[in-house]
Design a protein with these regions (language model features):
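Proline-enriched interdomain boundary motifs that mark the N-terminal boundary
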Residues: 86-96, 178-188, 272-280
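Short beta-strand segments within Ig-like beta-sandwich modules, predominantly Fibronectin type-III
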Residues: 132-138, 226-232, 314-320
């Protein structure tokens, strides 16, 4: 073997000589065992790990060597130093790995790993048709691209300081990432809007004949409040419910009926409409006193005008509390008041209903 690695399952035929795997730096001989042999292309070292039975690892000249029992591995380099067997590391924990992936880039987190991990993906459970082989450093995610939608098999093993590979952890998984969902546009995640119809917008997916849309009151989509199928455009307007937090997602459906996975959910909030303000002339007859319901952390923008279109504004202010007291206007007649709230994150609510205020003539100055 001049490069790469091999996994050998040697049965017990009637042979007088052991089966041998030869590399430029080592000879590995076995009878009736399962083991691995790897030739490191950078260092020239040969490593062997024994899973069952026993092997003998020695230099090509057979000047140095060692027997390796099951559960151990050893390495020999070009300097032909005597190899020292090391216990194989236990298999990585893949219990948290999902059984199904719905994005073209398969990502597997290994948050507890402190060793480099070798990861292989194959089309078959015997790993005879390996399509991806990589080493992942401690703390990094496994990222696998280029897989078709299908059932796949993944195995992982830890590497020690010599590069000796430990026991396998194996998991099967299904990739169903296509047709990919359209890109969601609005409402964006974290968006706020006032109570009322919500317009959902997305970019088209040319693979899709139609789009499925879901809106839920929970992130797990167990409480779906609105759903549509067969949408052929790039927008849909829906009434989803009262004030609160909602989540929406979309998915593609191909012409043959093949349904793809949903997009990542986007969270948005419907804020309640402002309550009508109350108030009018103060008891002293010298001021206007106005009040409404509002949150302590919000800024209240207020306006007083002579016309219902608020083109003739006579007073306006930004307040820290949901109340406003101002001097009685000098001119009698009809006035119009409204307010709106500005939240700390910059969200500006709609104007309230307009309060009509009648300011009587002040007879004291006649």
């Amino acid at each position: 073997m001049l490069r790469g690695s091999a996994e050998v399952l040697a049965a017990r035929p009637r042979r007088t000589q052991p089966l041998e795997v030869t590399t430029p730096t080592a000879v590995v001989g076995v009878r009736g065992t399962q083991y691995r042999v790897t030739l490191d292309g950078d260092s020239g070292a040969t490593r062997s790990e024994v899973l069952e039975g026993k092997v003998k690892l020695e230099s090509p000249q057979r000047s140095v060597g060692t027997d390796i029992a099951a559960g151990f591995g050893a390495a020999i380099d070009a300097a032909a130093r005597a190899p020292v067997p090391a216990k194989l590391l236990p298999a990585p924990d893949l219990a948290a790995m999902p059984e199904r992936f719905e994005r073209p880039l398969v990502r597997v987190a290994l948050p507890t790993e402190k060793d480099t991990v070798r990861v292989q993906v194959a089309q078959d459970a015997e790993f005879e048709r390996i399509v991806n082989d990589q080493k992942v450093t401690a703390g990094s995610d496994v990222r696998i691209a280029g897989l078709d939608d299908a059932k796949w098999f993944l195995r992982a093993r830890r590497l020690d300081g010599q590069g000796i590979e430990g026991y396998d952890a194996t998991r099967a998984f299904v990739l169903k990432a296509r047709p990919e969902p359209p890109a969601t546009n609005t409402p964006r995640s974290g968006a706020k809007q006032s109570l009322g119809p919500v317009e959902f917008n997305w970019s088209p997916n040319l693979e899709a004949k139609s789009v499925r849309l879901q809106v839920a009151s929970d992130a797990a989509f167990t409480q779906i409040v609105a759903a549509r199928e067969g949408l052929t455009g790039t927008r849909e307007t829906l009434e989803v419910g009262g004030p609160g937090t909602y989540h929406w997602r979309i998915a593609s459906t191909k012409a043959d009926g093949d349904k793809g996975p949903f997009s990542d959910a986007q969270r948005f909030e419907l804020r309640p409409l402002p309550e009508p303000p109350k108030g009018g002339m103060g008891e002293d007859g010298k001021s206007l006193t106005l009040a409404w319901s509002g949150r302590a952390e919000d800024t209240q923008h207020v306006e007083l005008a002579r016309d219902p279109a608020f083109k003739e504004i006579v007073a306006q202010a930004d307040l820290n509390a949901p109340e406003w007291t101002l001097p009685r206007p000098s001119s009698s007649g009809t006035y119009f008041f409204r307010y709106r709230s500005i939240e700390p994150d910059g969200f500006v609510g709609p104007y309230s209903a307009t309060l009509v205020i009648e300011v009587p003539r002040d007879w004291r100055y006649l």
